[in-house]
Amino acid sequence: MENKYIKTYDNVLTKDQCNQLIQKFEISTDQQVRTEMMNHRYFTEININQHKDWEGFVLNLYDIFRPYVETYKKDCNITYNQWPEKYGFEQMRFKKYNPDGKDEFKSHVDVGDYASARRFLVFFLYLDDNEEGQTGFDEYDIKVKPEPGRLLMFPPTWTYLHTAYKPVKKPKYIIGSYLHYI
């Protein structure tokens, strides 16, 4: 099944650029935080906006994402009166899901309370290929396969329940952010 507002864009980054980001993540062990919420979400992450040594990467990624906002609007036939005149990016989180049978983010939405209600568009940038570890939208029978440089964009609201499935053979690396109302 297809959904008008779930879009992917390939080759947003090259494989080399993706590998550089993964290598930087792996050597930044002192910045990594383990997230574990019983029976719901398990992964290791870095909020890369909070670390000076990631600043160049962050600015570059924002520059890369900006044209895709316009592409997304065009591809979804979004008109000027449907889109905020001003918006900003949320801080970026770099996540690693290990193939340990545990790491996943079970079915959820990305707007669940007042604090997250500013979000209106999700960005997931996949950094490696993975036979498993898809992002699934079960209601729409859509599974997005991780590929290096693939960008997934969709609304974060209750109509877009999604799951980060467990990787099986190797880790899955993604960078995520959101567009915010300002």
Which residue stretches match the model-derived regions?
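Histidine-centered catalytic micro-motifs
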Residues: 104-112
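Catalytic core of Fe(II)/2-oxoglutarate
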Residues: 119, 130-182
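Short beta-strand segments enriched in hydrophobic/aromatic residues
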Residues: 25, 98, 111, 127, ...
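Non-heme Fe(II)/2-oxoglutarate
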Residues: 1-86
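Acidic, glycine-rich loop-and-strand cores that form catalytic or ligand-binding grooves
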Residues: 82-101
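Short, conserved beta-strand element in jelly-roll/cupin
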Residues: 94-99, 113-131
